[in-house]
């Protein structure tokens, strides 16, 4: 095997590691704000958006907190905490504004190729769960951004909303559902490809495929040297220096953070969890289900286990997914290495991992129960949401890998975090995105927050402020509680993205 080394002496403005939605979103922001900046993006696979950004690999495809019950947990005092749901919905509204600006300026095309109306429905059964859902519904009534949510315990009404989940169900079963017609389905793979196509129109943007980042080192002048290995070009090595670095390569981000030598890396470990889905494209079944139906995780199960019967539109074709069923692999990426997990273990993060294992026995038990599931077990789980389901209509697929963040904690030794977290170097020139859900849906918000931290000296400038307010009309404002602004923003994004607009009314 031949190998050569090329050293790029010119300092680039920013290196983006990973060819997924997060890097594409950050690159798009920066190209709009500083079109003359040099941006290098490195993707280790042959194609971009092949990991978690891919529509087949997402755990969920339209997180807006309308129907994800794990974002509204019950507090010890019995009340419902809606703070996370509010944040996620506000974040998704920023994503919609970001995409709308790009469509208006012909940087994204044919919005129906990546976003479509899809009602978001919650469905539960049993006295305790129906009480919880009603309590959640009432708690969200005070929120402008959840205006329009409907609640029903009527079998006939719920059957009209989602026929599949009610056909064949015991008519005496206690059930409840909520519905948000404002819900959407998003194809993040298509969205990522379009963002990258747009970025490549600028000669200052350089995309390197089949190029693996193997090391990151800080230089004395506070720049960074990125070492890459290109498997397409006789395994040639390249070194490039950059003022800024963003590590957004999914599960592999933790390993590169560790290689960067940052002290911040010592506070984190990762636990890989995969997922499988039952999928059907049977037109007879699909025509009767036009919604994303989310249930409630069973007692003792972790938040990542929320089951859903999820209509998705992939490459113009409607599909129906049910799951997820948890899987375990030591890979940090779907197309990663079985050594990923073991290579990420250090003397400094080993103890937090052990503490998390000890303190999260329910998670361990849940994973074991998922791993030993038979086809019949999976069908039984599906029949709870689709009573007339037959296994012959469904196939099982392996979805993507996610790496849950484990963080050192003085009190408990280690905490398993469900969500995304951005880690920064002390001088804010390098950042890393760790974690998973809600991820893609809130990408525009997460990257906007990242701009505020990494580019503090730029974001306060008049030119950046003016441009950001042009891209995100609600920039610097909160929608929730502001009925006029909520309607103004939603009316605008619905018109541009060809979505149905439902006006929020006074409570």
UniProtKB/Swiss-Prot annotation:
Its EC number is 1.1.5.4. Gene3D superfamilies: FAD/NAD(P)-binding domain. Keywords: FAD, Flavoprotein, Oxidoreductase, Tricarboxylic acid cycle. GO terms for biological process: tricarboxylic acid cycle. It comes from the Bacteria. Pathway: Carbohydrate metabolism; tricarboxylic acid cycle; oxaloacetate from (S)-malate (quinone route): step 1/1. GO terms for molecular function: 2-hydroxyglutarate dehydrogenase activity; L-malate dehydrogenase (quinone) activity. Its cofactor is FAD. Signal peptide: none annotated. It catalyses: (S)-malate + a quinone = a quinol + oxaloacetate. Belongs to the MQO family. HAMAP family: MQO. This is Probable malate:quinone oxidoreductase. It comes from Baumannia cicadellinicola subsp. Homalodisca coagulata.
């Amino acid at each position: 095997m031949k190998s050569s080394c090329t050293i790029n002496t010119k300092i680039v403005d920013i290196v983006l590691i990973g060819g997924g939605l997060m890097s594409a979103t950050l690159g798009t922001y920066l190209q709009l704000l500083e079109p003359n900046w040099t941006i290098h993006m490195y993707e280790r696979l042959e194609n971009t958006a092949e990991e978690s950004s891919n529509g087949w690999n997402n755990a969920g495809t339209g997180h807006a907190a309308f129907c994800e019950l794990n974002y509204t947990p019950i507090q010890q005092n019995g009340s419902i905490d809606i703070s996370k749901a509010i944040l996620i919905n506000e974040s998704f509204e920023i994503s919609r504004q970001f995409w709308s600006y790009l469509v208006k300026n012909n940087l994204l095309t044919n919005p129906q190729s990546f976003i479509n109306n899809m009602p978001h429905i919650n469905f539960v059964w049993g006295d305790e769960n129906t009480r919880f859902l009603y309590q959640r519904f009432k708690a969200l009534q005070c929120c402008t951004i959840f205006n329009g949510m409907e609640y029903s315990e009527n079998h006939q009404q719920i059957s009209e909303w989602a026929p599949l989940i009610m056909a064949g169900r015991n008519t005496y079963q206690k059930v409840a559902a909520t519905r948000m017609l404002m819900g959407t389905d998003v194809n993040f793979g298509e969205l990522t490809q379009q963002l990258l196509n747009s970025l490549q129109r600028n000669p200052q943007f350089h995309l390197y495929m089949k190029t693996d980042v193997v090391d990151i080192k800080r230089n004395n002048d506070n720049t960074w040297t990125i070492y890459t290995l290109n498997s397409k070009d006789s395994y040639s090595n390249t070194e490039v220096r950059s003022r800024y670095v963003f590590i957004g390569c999914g599960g592999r981000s933790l390993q590169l953070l560790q290689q960067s030598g940052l002290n911040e890396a010592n506070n984190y470990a990762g636990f890989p969890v995969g997922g499988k889905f039952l999928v059907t494209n049977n037109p007879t079944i699909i025509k009767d289900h036009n919604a994303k139906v989310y249930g409630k995780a069973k007692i003792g199960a972790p938040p990542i286990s929320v089951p859903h019967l999820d209509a998705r539109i992939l490459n113009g074709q409607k599909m129906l997914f049910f799951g997820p069923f948890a899987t375990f692999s030591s890979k940090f990426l779907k197309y990663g290495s079985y050594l990923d997990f073991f290579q990420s273990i250090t003397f400094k993060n080993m103890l937090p991992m052990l503490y998390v294992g000890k303190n999260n026995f329910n998670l361990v038990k849940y994973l074991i129960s998922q791993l030993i599931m038979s086809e019949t077990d999976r069908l039984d789980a599906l029949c709870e949401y689709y009573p007339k389901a037959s296994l012959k209509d469904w196939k099982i697929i392996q979805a993507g890998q996610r790496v849950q963040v484990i963080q050192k904690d003085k009190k408990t030794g280690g905490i398993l975090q469900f969500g995304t977290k951005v880690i920064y170097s002390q001088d804010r020139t390098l950042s890393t995105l760790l974690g998973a859900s809600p991820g893609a849906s809130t990408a525009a918000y997460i990257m906007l927050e990242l701009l505020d931290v990494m580019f503090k000296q730029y974001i306060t400038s008049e030119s950046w402020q003016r441009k950001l307010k042009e891209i995100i009309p609600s920039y610097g404002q909160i929608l929730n509680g502001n009925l006029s602004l909520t309607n103004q923003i939603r009316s605008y994004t619905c018109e541009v993205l060809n979505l149905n607009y439902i006006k929020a009314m006074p409570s």
